[in-house]
């Protein structure tokens, strides 16, 4: 395995809308998500095995910082995660959008094993892109 990068940026959008026929979306990132672009390192995040980085190799970052796990050629990427428990959410349907990538340097091969998750939902991460998923809050937490 060559160098492998996994970059996550939680600064996309967290929106909420009503489940009624008339759908109204409201941007709620700043209301519920703390330190969404990791500008304060891992403050407010549960981190296991990831590091912050400030170089320019992740073009979708918002601000100066992003999160990555990088390993040298011939090494395997270890299990890692970064998460945040959101509380006091209003009941409803939410959409989480995250800028992320899961790549092996100098290879166009599709990589696996990286996910964006919220509550019981997840979406697989591959090439650099915005990844979205929806989840439902019933008891105020995700």
Predicted regions and their residues:
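Bacterial Sec-dependent N-terminal signal peptides
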Residues: 1-26
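Boundary/junction segments of secreted and surface-exposed precursor proteins
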Residues: 24-34
């Amino acid at each position: 395995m060559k160098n492998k990068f996994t970059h996550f940026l939680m600064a996309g959008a967290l929106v909420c809308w009503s489940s009624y026929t008339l759908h109204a979306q409201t941007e709620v990132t700043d209301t519920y998500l703390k330190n969404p672009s990791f500008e304060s390192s891992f403050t407010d995040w549960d981190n296991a095995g990831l590091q912050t980085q400030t170089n320019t190799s992740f073009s979708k970052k918002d601000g100066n910082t992003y999160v990555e796990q990088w390993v040298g050629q011939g090494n395997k990427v270890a299990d890692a995660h970064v998460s945040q428990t959101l509380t006091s959410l209003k009941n409803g349907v939410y959409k989480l959008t995250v800028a992320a990538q899961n790549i092996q340097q100098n290879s166009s091969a599709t990589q696996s094993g990286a996910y964006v998750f919220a509550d019981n939902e997840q979406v697989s991460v591959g090439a650099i892109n915005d990844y979205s998923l929806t989840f439902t809050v019933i008891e105020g937490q995700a």
